[in-house]
C-alpha cells in the first residue's frame, strides 16, 4: 500500500512499505504517523490513500 500525504504549501509526501494488513487507515494515520485525523481529509483508493490538510 502507498500513502500519499498532500499539504497545501509543501510537495506531496509519499510513505511507502505500509503493511497490507492495515485494517483501519484512520488509526494508522493517527497512531503510527502522528497526524490528527480531525485535521485531515483523506480518501482511500486501491492500495493508495490520499491525505490533505484541512
Where are these regions (language model features)?
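Short, mixed-charge low-complexity intrinsically disordered segments
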Residues: 30-54
